[in-house]
């Protein structure tokens, strides 16, 4: 019985520390910096990432189809409790927000390797992966569970704008 209790405590403590074990700085995400472009079925996309400045990074994004904006995004990554946390908002034309004003979408950094960062929503329904493939290419992979709980994947193959 003592062994079972000890093992249970060990697994609970290990699982809790694993979830909080990633330590990273916003500076570790500097590989994302640049102006990235892509022609996609949704439209022409442009995603700008400013380099880290202090404890944060910022991004703006636009998708334009047939000369008309489809939607915008504004993103910040801020150092929060030792880990970069992404906050995202979407906007229709006219700067009409999708999310409530006090509730941006939030994604915690869950994995970081050289030139690759994975962010995940608190409800674990969305993962965003940023991977710098080479000096001119970066993939952004959106993995999202649909209403049936099945993962859907969109890959955005960006090229660095000269």
Residue positions per predicted region:
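Edge beta-strand at a domain terminus
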Residues: 100-101, 107-108, 137-139, 144-162
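N-terminal helix-cap/turn-to-beta initiation motif at the start of protein domains
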Residues: 21-35
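Central antiparallel beta-sheet cores of small beta-barrel/beta-sandwich binding domains
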Residues: 44-121
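Extended Gly/Ser/Thr-rich low-complexity repeat segments
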Residues: 129-137
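Short beta-strand segments
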Residues: 45-47, 73, 126-128, 152-156
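Structural preference for beta-rich elements and adjacent junctions enriched in aromatics
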Residues: 122-124, 134
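Bacterial Sec-dependent N-terminal signal peptides
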Residues: 1-24
């Amino acid at each position: 019985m003592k062994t079972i209790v000890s093992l249970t405590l060990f697994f609970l403590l290990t699982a809790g520390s694993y979830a909080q074990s990633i330590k990273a700085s916003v500076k570790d995400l500097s590989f994302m910096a640049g102006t990235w472009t892509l022609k996609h079925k949704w439209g022409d996309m442009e995603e700008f990432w400013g380099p880290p400045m202090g404890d944060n990074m910022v991004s703006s994004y636009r998708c334009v189809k047939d000369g008309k904006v489809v939607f915008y995004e504004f993103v910040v990554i801020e150092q929060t409790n030792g880990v970069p946390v992404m906050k995202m908002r979407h906007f229709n034309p006219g700067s009409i927000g999708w999310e409530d004003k006090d509730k941006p979408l939030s994604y915690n950094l869950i994995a970081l390797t050289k030139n690759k960062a994975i962010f995940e929503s608190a409800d674990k329904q969305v993962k965003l992966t940023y991977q710098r493939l080479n000096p001119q290419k970066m993939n952004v992979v959106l993995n999202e569970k649909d209403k049936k709980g099945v993962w859907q994947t969109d890959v955005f193959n960006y090229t660095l704008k000269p």
